[in-house]
From Swiss-Prot:
<feature type="binding site">
    <location>
        <position position="214"/>
    </location>
    <ligand>
        <name>Mg(2+)</name>
    </ligand>
</feature>
<comment type="function">
    <text>Succinyl-CoA synthetase functions in the citric acid cycle (TCA), coupling the hydrolysis of succinyl-CoA to the synthesis of either ATP or GTP and thus represents the only step of substrate-level phosphorylation in the TCA. The beta subunit provides nucleotide specificity of the enzyme and binds the substrate succinate, while the binding sites for coenzyme A and phosphate are found in the alpha subunit.</text>
</comment>
<dbReference type="GO" id="GO:0000287">
    <property type="term" value="F:magnesium ion binding"/>
</dbReference>
<feature type="binding site">
    <location>
        <position position="200"/>
    </location>
    <ligand>
        <name>Mg(2+)</name>
    </ligand>
</feature>
<feature type="binding site">
    <location>
        <position position="107"/>
    </location>
    <ligand>
        <name>ATP</name>
    </ligand>
</feature>
<dbReference type="GO" id="GO:0006099">
    <property type="term" value="P:tricarboxylic acid cycle"/>
</dbReference>
<feature type="binding site">
    <location>
        <begin position="53"/>
        <end position="55"/>
    </location>
    <ligand>
        <name>ATP</name>
    </ligand>
</feature>
<dbReference type="InterPro" id="IPR005809">
    <property type="entry name" value="Succ_CoA_ligase-like_bsu"/>
</dbReference>
<dbReference type="GO" id="GO:0042709">
    <property type="term" value="C:succinate-CoA ligase complex"/>
</dbReference>
<keyword id="KW-0547">Nucleotide-binding</keyword>
<comment type="subunit">
    <text>Heterotetramer of two alpha and two beta subunits.</text>
</comment>
<keyword id="KW-0460">Magnesium</keyword>
<keyword id="KW-0479">Metal-binding</keyword>
<dbReference type="GO" id="GO:0005829">
    <property type="term" value="C:cytosol"/>
</dbReference>
<comment type="similarity">
    <text>Belongs to the succinate/malate CoA ligase beta subunit family.</text>
</comment>
<dbReference type="GO" id="GO:0004775">
    <property type="term" value="F:succinate-CoA ligase (ADP-forming) activity"/>
</dbReference>
<feature type="domain" description="ATP-grasp">
    <location>
        <begin position="9"/>
        <end position="245"/>
    </location>
</feature>
Amino acid sequence: MNLHEYQSKHLLKKYNIPVPASEVVFNPDAAVDAAAKIGGDRWVVKAQVHAGGRGKAGGVRLVKNKEELKSAVKALLGTRLVTYQTDERGQPVNQILVEQTSDIARELYLGAVIDRASQRIVFMASTEGGVEIEKVAEKSPEKILKVTIDPAIGLQPFQCRQLFFGLGLQDLKQMRSFTDIVMGLYRLFTERDLSLLEINPLVITGSGELICLDAKINIDDSALYRQSELREMRDTTQEDEHETMAQQWELNYIKLDGNIGCMVNGAGLAMATMDLIKLSGGDPANFLDVGGSATKERVTEAFKIIVSDKNVKGILVNIFGGIVRCDLIADGIISAVKEVGIDVPVVVRLEGNNAQLGAKKLADSDMNIIAAKGFADAAEQIVKQVGVIA
């Protein structure tokens, strides 16, 4: 789950991490009131969307008076911001962050992720702050400093100093401030079950202060059950509606660009199914794993999600019956197809427990359901059916 910048900074303040004074607003008049509360004669207006690259897309603007402020907020609210991290439709702008300006002398990058190779949290720092860190990692990986944290003892102050001096910094007062910031970020990361934390940029002001000018936070979805405060921060308007619907039924769904819908039980089998569709000349429209308990209700909801994608011209169902019986799965598929009213061809491959009985039920259903003879046959059949429609 992703957070907006204003939500991320709200968390940073709870951990005594310095951020600029700011207010989130939902209309132009509130922006003027926020500016008066913040003070000063210039402000930064930031569109709140779950995507990077806002500045280049016009989503971050410097305003020099309250008339410009009101105009900028009015121009951004209700629009869809398209950045290099969004699709062509962009993300809806429903909130604006009005923030005080900062006297920037230097921009740094600071981040933390879970490294799957070492199975530990890794903190990263770079002198290349304020730019797309992905490009830095690709073109100049030597400019990214890393420290790996031993979970038995946690982040240690000497590791913070290691990053500090690695950035070419020397001032002792700044070192104490930097250490406090990194230690605070580590506590935030571990206590709130984060999967990604980025401060980009971490700025050094003209007076030598360190301030977190922008913040990006991703939370581990698997831990949301114990993070009730963060769970309430979810903004479903920033998420794909199909994926949101799938989460309600504990279905693992990711929308893709093809026209062949996929419903599979098991993530590995789902990936193999998409590979075989591509190998057979087709394009999968989604990844959808219904999990081990492919009940009638979940199968029905899975079909609803798949057919809600208007690009879908056919559906491939690939089920391996281990504990669950294939004949019961067949009953669920037939019932779901009737209930949802699917008018595109459906190819079903059943393998495992009672697979032959399940295939017979599908064949006897008098519906537009094709029982495949095997994995490869299933992929070839659905590609053929979709090709006929096209």
